[in-house]
Amino acid sequence: MKKIIYLVLLALITGLAAQAHEKTGEWNGCDRYDFTFKDRQATIVVPKKAAKGNPWIWRPAFFDAFPSVDKALLEKGFHIVYYDVTHLYGSPRAVSLGTEFYENMTDLYNLSEKVTLEGFSRGGLFVFNWAAQNTEKVACIYVDAPVCDVFSWPGRKNTALWNDLLKEWNLTDAGMEHFKGNPIDNLAPIAAAGIPIISVCGDSDQTVPYKENMDVVRSRYLAAGGPVEVILKKGCGHHPHSLDNPEPVVDFILRQQPEYEKYIHCCLLYTSPSPRDYAASR
């Protein structure tokens, strides 16, 4: 009986090992693994020393673009993870694929069950829509100049991308009048779960206008009781993303992790010696 149990366990371990991926290079001095999952490109960068709880930050689009936050988190022991659903516009198919990918990361790689979601530009569509359906799996959200309303971007004027969106969502242009897939309209579950959001945006963004996207999210999220912070860059357009000094975003993300150890602030009381005590000590 013991031999049978041993063989079963060995088979399971061997099966898991077979799913592992060979190193394909390095990214900022750490091992990088590129592979496909459900026929889509994926990447994992493994820190030299993983932080407690195996935290990870997950991008659904634009790996290695303006990576100041990713680099800083990698140094602090985060796994940097990418799964390409860039051109799926936060569709139900994208959300379903993302959930399967998440389960693979937490089961096979033993990454934290609470993921930090990172959405740049159109990546915001996936981040918000996936979070709305998987609130228990999210530690926090970092979005940068995010698309939050498809009528703002790509919008009907961008004919090629608009038709691409319609095809992915299996909708007609007329059917979009009743579209229910915009992040700005699906914030209630995220706010109810109290998921913290931080966003970096340019106030002069002409591609994904702040007032039509993240500013709407900010006002509605606050009204729903959700915690949100926005860093607004004056005079900045859609690019460059992120911050030259990523510390405000990194600190925000670190504070939301399940294994984060809050600082204990201590006050050391000090009483100045009296002149008599001072004289006696001489």
PLM features per residue range, with description:
Residues 20-52, 160-164, 261-264:
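A domain-start/cap signature at the N-terminus of enzymes
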Residues 90-109:
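Alpha/beta-hydrolase active-site loop
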Residues 110-121:
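Alpha/beta-hydrolase fold nucleophile elbow
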Residues 119-129:
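Glycine-rich nucleophile elbow surrounding the catalytic serine of serine-hydrolase chemistry
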Residues 129-174:
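Hydrolase active-site cap/lid region
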Residues 166-213:
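The feature captures the conserved acid-bearing segment of alpha/beta-hydrolase catalytic domains
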Residues 212-218, 222-266:
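C-terminal catalytic histidine-bearing segment of alpha/beta-hydrolase fold enzymes
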Residues 270-277:
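Conserved small/polar residues in nucleotide/adenosyl-binding loops
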